[in-house]
Amino acid sequence: MPTDKKFMTGYEVVVCACQDAGAESMYGYPITPTCEILSGWANSGKSYLQTEDEIAAGFGVCGAVMAGQKSFTASAGPGHILLQDSFSMAEAMRLPFVMIVGQRGGPSSGTVIYSQQEVTLACYGGNGEGMRFVYSPSSIAELYKLTRQAFNDAWHYRFPAVVLTDGYTLKTRGVIDFDKIGTIENIPAHQLVPEDKVVHWPNIYTFEEELYDEVMLAQKDFEAVAGDVAMVEELQTEDAEILIIAHGIVAASAKDAIEILRKQDKKVGLFRPITLRPFPKKQLDKTASGK
């Protein structure tokens, strides 16, 4: 991890964060606005595979993490849709799959630079109950921290994780002060499938009762850690009569709006969910009620 100030793009920050998190490999297929993550990772000399499509990339990550590697992918829009197949399998098998998503506007190919239109897909895409962690950074400094945290939480709690960003954040070049971020300890990876014996690790169940038991167990585990994982940022909510709820790069604009409105004697505050899944509902209810 660098120990001083750097002038970096969001792409460079992601690559740096993944390296510092101990990631060993990346599987991906180029798609705007995340192409530079793949090329940046490849240029760093780390192991990578540009696959034939996002379906192959996702299952490549699944295989890598089962073998004990910290691995990840990056995609957007239509590619993100294809990745939900492998990502929901990772949810079912409790694999520490990390995915960086640079959101696109939809439907389908839509726009390529900005959007908040992949929130539902990131939180609940694929068939399943949405038992995954979704982080929404609002600055390039936070992009670094939350990418590091995505790896740590995924490997510690054994749920897949998404860092949900966009083209504005990824293409922004700004100063990131690594001294202010401080030291972040890594949760080590470990081999999930032993080499010395044959293991059958099911990702499909024959009977409805069997599937029900597995889903309920995973949901219980997810709910147990939700309070530890969920994060929020609040700004001037103590006396707020109007509460703005925003996340990601939009929350950065909301902060400027609040400053302007406060100068006009309007009591406006910001509630920013840093994690969209698990969503910090209890904190929002408390803040919105004014208690």
Regions of interest found by a model, annotated:
Residues 45-46, 158-234:
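Conformationally flexible catalytic loops at phosphate/diphosphate-handling active centers
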Residues 7-14, 219-242, 255, 259:
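Glycine-/acidic-rich phosphate or pyrophosphate-binding loops and their flanking alpha/beta elements
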Residues 113-167:
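Conserved thiamine diphosphate
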Residues 104-106, 165-172, 248-250:
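Glycine-rich beta-alpha junction loops
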Residues 83, 172-174, 253-255:
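Short helix/loop capping segments that flank catalytic or ligand/cofactor-binding pockets
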Residues 231, 237-266, 271, 277-284:
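Redox- and metal-dependent alpha/beta enzyme cores, enriched for Fe-S-associated oxidoreductases
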Residues 1-125, 130-131, 139:
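Thiamine diphosphate
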Residues 42-44, 88-91, 116, 148-153, ...:
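Short, solvent-exposed amphipathic alpha-helical segments in soluble enzyme
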